[in-house]
């Protein structure tokens, strides 16, 4: 069992593993959880990785444990994964703060991630999810939509707002650009959570994330926006909670009227950023929901309009038991 750390990062599923590989060397307290050995990379070790195996029937009807992934089947993934979550959380215990990284469009990550978040939040831990919505296929779109609903379910069950930092895989945007944005967010969160800044302690971070404990607000899914200047932060509609970091205290200017605001001052000799703002709001979740709905409507129209061809078989053709046909 690992000891308590300041920030634990959990990389879940295939997308999580790929991000974790890119993030290697930036933070040491990381771990990986998946259902497929095919997603393992050179930085995975027995100490930092758990691969959940499923009972699989072979051709001779014998059963065998195999780690071959879940084929984007979220229901099957949930049936396999749910019983393992307490043991995973025990093996990789929560840090003072926690980041969980996964895709919404697959199966393993989109079930491991929210299940782990639910478990940790029910233990009172501070958790932020960094998630990737996907529109590239019908099943990825349906899984992303189901994941968004799952986040609301996790909020309801844990009685803690589920905080997501949201990214999208969409046409015209290279995967490398999406990955780079995620890496910037992870670096920023690790800095925010490192407990090294003047006037910003762990309780300040806890109050920022668990704003619902001090204000009469709905316990729902909320979105975290990571902003690198004041104008960007001010553009976020209806902010609920803001944490800000400055390397120059004289740059500290009120951004907006919010329920919770906490500010810290980072060492300018150690960090080269001017300011960072971590803005939580709820209204942006509605934008995500609408985009997913619009995409599903487009997908349904495309399926309905898909041309169907006539079979090459006619009523007189006879197929063998193997499907062979002789003209």
UniProtKB/Swiss-Prot annotation:
Residue positions binding GTP: 14-15, 107-109
Listed Pfam families: TubZ_C_2
Localization per record: Host cytoplasm
Regulation: The non-hydrolyzable GTP analog GMPCPP stabilizes filaments, which never disassemble.
E.C. no: 3.6.5.-
Site residues, GTP hydrolysis: 201, 204
Top-level taxon in the UniProt lineage: Viruses
Compositional bias of kind Polar residues: 318-327
EC main group: hydrolase
Keywords: GTP-binding, Host cytoplasm, Hydrolase, Nucleotide-binding
Residues covered by region (Disordered): 303-327
Reactions accelerated catalytically: GTP + H2O = GDP + phosphate + H(+)
A GO term, aspect molecular function: GTPase activity
Cellular component terms (Gene Ontology): host cell cytoplasm
Quaternary structure (record): Homomultimer. Polymerizes in a strictly GTP-dependent manner.
Record family assignment: Belongs to the FtsZ family. PhuZ subfamily.
Domain comment, as recorded: Consists of two domains: a nucleotide-binding N-terminus that hydrolyzes GTP and a C-terminus domain necessary for polymerization. The domains are bridged by a long, central helix. Interactions between the C-terminus and the following monomer drive polymerization.
Protein's job: A tubulin-like GTPase that forms filaments, which are required for positioning viral DNA and capsids in the middle of the host cell for optimal replication. The motor component of a partition system which pushes phage DNA (encased by protein gp105) to the center of the bacterial host cell. Also required for movement of phage capsids to the vicinity of the viral DNA and rotation of the encased viral DNA at midcell. Forms filaments during the lytic phase, which position phage DNA at the center of the bacterial host cell.
Protein name per the record: Phage tubulin-like protein
Organism of origin: Pseudomonas phage phiKZ
